[in-house]
Amino acid sequence: MRAVLAREMDGRRVLGRFWSGWRRGLGVRPVPEDAGFGTEARHQRQPRGSCQRSGPLGDQPFAGLLPKNLSREELVDALRAAVVDRKGPLVTLNKPQGLPVTGKPGELTLFSVLPELSQSLGLREQELQVVRASGKESSGLVLLSSCPQTASRLQKYFTHARRAQRPTATYCAVTDGIPAASEGKIQAALKLEHIDGVNLTVPVKAPSRKDILEGVKKTLSHFRVVATGSGCALVQLQPLTVFSSQLQVHMVLQLCPVLGDHMYSARVGTVLGQRFLLPAENNKPQRQVLDEALLRRLHLTPSQAAQLPLHLHLHRLLLPGTRARDTPVELLAPLPPYFSRTLQCLGLRLQ
């Protein structure tokens, strides 16, 4: 298995290449042949500002987030700096948390600045298009292509892999709570429901054929607990279906909402230390509430915790090789600084 890995060294990214053999030097390392779901991932080097060095955050924002009120030019510059690999028509980004891929006309999104990004990267003949991307609230890999034929081939590959239940995407998540099982499958029927002006993903028990025809979808994810500590867990998640907020809702169904989930975490209630699910339809989105012990461990005040970004990161993608029998190509995106800081505070490691 060949890999692409970008790491930050003294503020500068070191870029790897794929499909063209190993590029020796910093940031590019071979990964084990057993690079499936149980692969031992490499622990990201802790950035400056980790818990052991700096303690409380003070009034500083969480490191690794996009500044608010960016101009189009500033967003293009930020995305260009987020490029972790270029090969042929493919461009891979490590998307910051909070940046939407698409949106309403006039909104600043990844899609809206693709023409400028294409020009900035010197792609004049063909404009970049999105092949695969993490959602707005999650961070991580975005795969772009300037070749429509390549984009179509990759999209067919991802579709066939899902039908065969072969995971191609691996997310890292930190959860508030520890799943009862160390690994397994999460299956749930989900639907989108408009509640108080917001589109929310809602579980559906025992969906009927009519429900399926009306948009209810059966969803499936694999999960594996990598490490636990301080009542939290580092979990690897592999979605085998595609649905809005699927991974967040799946972890809520495990009574372990993702840290920084201010959309669905209120569906988990606690009485006398025991967690239980509350009716999704009756629970509006609200800021996630963390207990005092966890706040102390994270060196956060309640007001800071209310701004905690979602700790859900598209860490790895598998792509087909150049020939049918080639081993898959692995793309890796390093964790955001705020994510690494949380792992440090909780004593969690990607083993």
Curated annotation (Swiss-Prot):
Instruction: Name a GO molecular-function annotation.
Output: pseudouridine synthase activity
Report the record's Gene Ontology biological process terms. mRNA processing; mRNA pseudouridine synthesis; positive regulation of mitochondrial translation
Q: Could you tell me which residues form the transit peptide?
A: 1-25
Q: What is its main location?
A: mitochondrion
- Tell me the enzyme class: isomerase
Q: Does the keyword Magnesium apply?
A: no
Q: Which reaction does it catalyse?
A: a uridine in mRNA = a pseudouridine in mRNA
Output the Gene Ontology cellular-component terms. mitochondrial matrix; mitochondrion; ribonucleoprotein granule
Q: Which residues carry this modification: Phosphoserine?
A: 71
Q: Which Gene3D superfamilies does this UniProt record tie to the protein?
A: Pseudouridine synthase
> What EC number(s) does the entry state?
5.4.99.-
> Which superkingdom, per the lineage?
Eukaryota
Query: Which keywords appear in this protein's UniProt record, sorted alphabetically?
Result: Isomerase, Mitochondrion, mRNA processing, Phosphoprotein, Transit peptide
User: Where's it found, cell-wise?
Assistant: Mitochondrion matrix
UniProt keyword Transferase, yes or no: no
- From the UniProt entry, list the residue stretches annotated as the region Disordered: 33-58
Please state which protein family the record places this protein in: Belongs to the pseudouridine synthase RluA family.
Record's subunit section: Forms a regulatory protein-RNA complex, consisting of RCC1L, NGRN, RPUSD3, RPUSD4, TRUB2, FASTKD2 and 16S mt-rRNA.
> What this chain does, per the record?
Catalyzes uridine to pseudouridine isomerization (pseudouridylation) of specific mitochondrial mRNAs (mt-mRNAs), a post-transcriptional modification necessary for their translation. Acts at position 390 in COXI mt-mRNA and at position 697-699 in mitochondrial COXIII mt-mRNA. As a component of a functional protein-RNA module, consisting of RCC1L, NGRN, RPUSD3, RPUSD4, TRUB2, FASTKD2 and 16S mitochondrial ribosomal RNA (16S mt-rRNA), controls 16S mt-rRNA abundance and may play a role in mitochondrial ribosome biogenesis.
Record protein name field: Mitochondrial mRNA pseudouridine synthase RPUSD3
